[in-house]
From Swiss-Prot:
Assembly, per entry: Part of the 30S ribosomal subunit. Forms a tight heterodimer with protein bS6.
Gene3D superfamilies according to UniProt: Ribosomal protein S18
Annotated GO biological process: translation
Gene Ontology MF terms: small ribosomal subunit rRNA binding; structural constituent of ribosome
Keywords: Ribonucleoprotein, Ribosomal protein, RNA-binding, rRNA-binding
One Pfam family, short name: Ribosomal_S18
Protein's UniProt name: Small ribosomal subunit protein bS18
Organism: Acidobacterium capsulatum (strain ATCC 51196 / DSM 11244 / BCRC 80197 / JCM 7670 / NBRC 15755 / NCIMB 13165 / 161)
Region (Disordered): 1-34
Compositional bias per record (Polar residues), positions renumbered to this chain: 1-10
InterPro entries to which the protein is assigned, alphabetical: Ribosomal_bS18, Ribosomal_bS18_sf
Length: 105
């Protein structure tokens, strides 16, 4: 019973712990301006590149991280079919030593 009487909120006006001037967002930040993220489009579809050449090291390096890992689709914006072809081309280039398997230390 004693706990119920201690936790009663004041009924007059707004509570002092919450500012009423700005509403907060879902993650605790200010509910301000939302950033617009442009939809990523497949580079190979827009340029109508059908076959991805495994010898084009400059093109393939754009899709390999500096540690040597293949960058995922959600970061590059490449469509599913071209991501598969790109992965195959990167692996071929690695096997004939055009691209490194891992980064230098």
């Amino acid at each position: 019973m004693a706990e119920e009487t201690n936790q009663q909120a004041p009924e007059s006006g707004a509570s002092s712990s919450q500012p009423t001037s700005r509403p907060s967002g879902p993650r605790g930040g200010s509910g301000g301006r939302k950033f617009f993220r442009r939809k990523k489009v497949c580079k190979f579809c827009t340029e109508k590149i059908d076959a991805i050449p495994y010898r084009d090291v400059r093109l393939l390096q754009q899709f390999v991280a500096e540690r040597g890992k293949i960058v995922p689709r959600r970061l590059t914006g490449v469509c599913t079919t071209h991501q598969r072809r790109l992965t195959r081309a990167i692996k071929q280039a690695r096997n004939i030593a055009l691209l490194p398997f891992a980064a230098r230390y």
